[in-house]
Amino acid sequence: MDVNGHPKFQPSPETDGPLPLTSSTLMVSKSLQQDSLSMVGDRLPPKTGAVVIDMGTGTCKVGFAGQSQPTYTVATILGCQPKKQATKDQSELETFIGEAARSRPELRLVKPIRNGIVVDWEAAELIWRHILEHDLQVATHEHPLLFSDPPFSPATNREKLVEVAFESLHSPALYVASQSVLSVYAHGRVNGLVVDTGHGVSYTVPVVQGYNLPHAIQRLDLAGNHLTAFLAEMLLGSGFSLQQEDLDLVENIKHHYCYLAPDFQKEQARPDEECKQSLKLPDGRTVTLGKELFQCPELLFHPPEIPGLSPIGLPAMAEQSLLKVPQELRPHVARNVILCGGSSLFTGLEGRFRAELLHSLSPEDHVVVMAHPNRNLSVWIGGSILASLHAFQSCWVLREQYEERGPQVVYRKCY
């Protein structure tokens, strides 16, 4: 069912004819287009009580539905220590998240997400609780929660998410939405090919009328944190002294100075001296880097030969995903190729990706690549739009429904 509660068209390879546009599809599409445009401008849809949570490998983004951007974006890192004085009604642990946790060397840091998937539910819950209660300062039992979920997440993770939301956070209502679908909604569309490269994982997913096409998903377990590790290795190899706490400096270099070369072979052939840059770091030190600055993000286009790692990069992944979309549906997807995720923000990436994808496909495919300036927030913005739509309000999984049917209710209401 779509967000209006009507049956949705479910694409299959056997479908003949053009993509059907039902009245409900048109209504949803129009609502999404109107609201997504207003999110970018000065006008906003009415703020609802719902809270949107998009927790990725690198950052957790949280804010109220109807806002144009999350209220809090913090590193997905948790550190805990015993409270010196805790009452009987209080937790015995004092939690620190994000930079507050990093700044305390005495804490053991936990990263609850690996390659986009929650692997430590206790730590994930503590991060959510900390942001909701201490930062947003809301009573969790009063606010519906919309969570994003990777398109390749195990189904059991959704069940666990429902349990945490209702049993631990005591939310009155919940919805779990696919990250790729939310990214499409953020652009006012219901169809598109999402090319997402974030901190822990990269993937391409075709979306048709708000549904992922699972058979066409391409995944690459290489993203921002792997690029940071590569750059750190290059710095160490050049004699630059690095400690574990200096990884933030490496991240800073990566974000501000790394770029995708329009032509890698041509850039690689330039004399080393022409490529060198002297970089002033926030801590006052100076480092000289050269070809590492474009060799680092090049890994997204040409992954290293590592056992178990997909050998194809983002443009080839996008091509393979598109070619797996049924022919009659492909035009609706190809004209909305959406770049998103923090690692898509490298200078030169949009142009290089577009050029390689267009070169590999036929002009008849009419490929259009979209890259919004805030594409690192696409998933959260899509959730903010969806949860604030009037037509969506009947789609929440309510506490009463959970108590009646258990965590499996998520499969009936969240697609």
UniProtKB/Swiss-Prot annotation:
Subcellular location as annotated: Cytoplasmic vesicle, Secretory vesicle, Acrosome; Cytoplasm, Cytoskeleton, Perinuclear theca
Keyword annotations of the record: Cytoplasm, Cytoplasmic vesicle, Cytoskeleton, Fertilization
SUPFAM superfamilies per the UniProt record, alphabetical: Actin-like ATPase domain (SSF53067)
Top-level taxonomic group: Eukaryota
Presence of keyword Hydrolase: no
Record-linked Gene3D superfamilies: 3.30.420.40, Actin, Chain A, domain 4
Gene Ontology CC entries for this record: acrosomal vesicle; perinuclear theca; sperm head
Pfam hit, one: Actin
Region (Disordered): 1-22
Principal location listed in the UniProt entry: cytoplasm
Biological processes, Gene Ontology terms: acrosome assembly; fertilization; single fertilization
Subunit field text: Interacts with ACTL7A.
Family affiliation: Belongs to the actin family.
Functional note: Testis-specic protein that plays an important role in fusion of proacrosomal vesicles and perinuclear theca formation.
Protein name stated in the entry: Actin-like protein 9
Organism per entry: Mus musculus (Mouse)
